[in-house]
Amino acid sequence: MQPSMICFVLFLSVVLVTGCAAPSFEDRIDDLLTPYQSPQPGLAMRLVRGEQVVIERTIGLAELDSLQTVGATTNFRLASITKHLTALAILMLIEDRRLTLDTRLNAILPQFPEYAERISIQHLLQHQSGLPDYEPLVPLDRQPRIRDQGVVNLLQEVSELSFEPGTSYHYSNSGYALLAVIVETITGQAFETFLEERIFNPSKMSQSVAFVQGQNEIPNRAIGYTVGDAEIIETDQSDYSAVLGDGGVYSSIADLTTWHRVGFGRALISGRLFKAMMTPALERYGFGWRIDQFEGQTRYHHSGSASGFRNFIAHFPDIDLTLMLLTNRAGPDVLPIGEEILRIYFEQESI
């Protein structure tokens, strides 16, 4: 065979092999995230193992009018991912011997009806209080937006519980709004100040903030949107967006990486309390975290859904792996996307 023909055959072989090669790990991830490309509302995703960033993607727009792009320090509303921070604040007060898991609601907020003597702090943490969701109780024309104390005012008018505390599970934002007010009542500090001074500052989470309109600012803020068939509508705030305890913290993948590296607050409380936080009860819910098995690995995780935002975080303690996925659009649900990212990674690493 002529040398030129040999070269051609070798070249053709390389082309064929390359063309048939399976998509790379990063290509498969990028395919999943295609809907978030500019000029759409965007996404910040980071997968971290130990000290190493395995993969990071920041795509799309944080704010459409200014065409501000999403970056690692872009702050998204965490929505219900906030709950583990509220739970941690309560556990820190238990560490300070100012509360116990068995402390009753009426011992702190005596204005509640008699049933409050049967509701414990642990019931509130694990959605077992029997209190109803507060959202349907909020008047439609209420101004200004309801805050945590306003939730307390509504709930104390509830005459009976949905079920006996501790006997059933009903996911509810009400308990976590109450927990924020309990922190304020016991400490005399605003909840946002407690989080800043006791959690964010010691943990070097410089971007994170529990947002209170007119009192603090959100650096590098992402605005929330709803993407329709014909238009994109700003839906950044709802009637419930001023409630802090159930979903009012803003943070970034940069700060959540720092949070991963300091063990999600492990150093701020005793090992006994951290273990209690991560112990599943009814419906496998701990204190602000869901605990289950995923692909054979223990997983702590939570989703967050608020007006204009959908988020997901998952931590695998046995392999020190954390996925954080933050978006500033009302849909789609990012839980399936996050779990597919994890499956792709586990497949690559043979985990």
Label the predicted regions.
Residues M1-F8:
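Bacterial N-terminal signal peptides that target proteins for export
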Residues T18-G19:
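C-terminal motif of bacterial Sec signal peptides marking the signal peptidase cleavage site
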Residues S24, R28-L32, S80, L85, ...:
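Extracytoplasmic/secreted proteins, especially bacterial periplasmic and envelope-associated proteins
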Residues F25-F76, T100, S159, Q297:
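Short, conserved catalytic-motif segment at the N-terminal edge
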Residues Y36-A44, S66-H123, F163-S174, L244-G247, ...:
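Short active-site loop at a secondary-structure junction
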Residues E63, A116-S307:
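Short, surface-exposed loop or secondary-structure junction motifs
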Residues E295, R329-I351:
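Short, gly/Ser/Thr-rich active-site loops of penicillin-recognizing serine hydrolases
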Residues H301-H302, F312-R329:
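Short, well-ordered beta-strand elements
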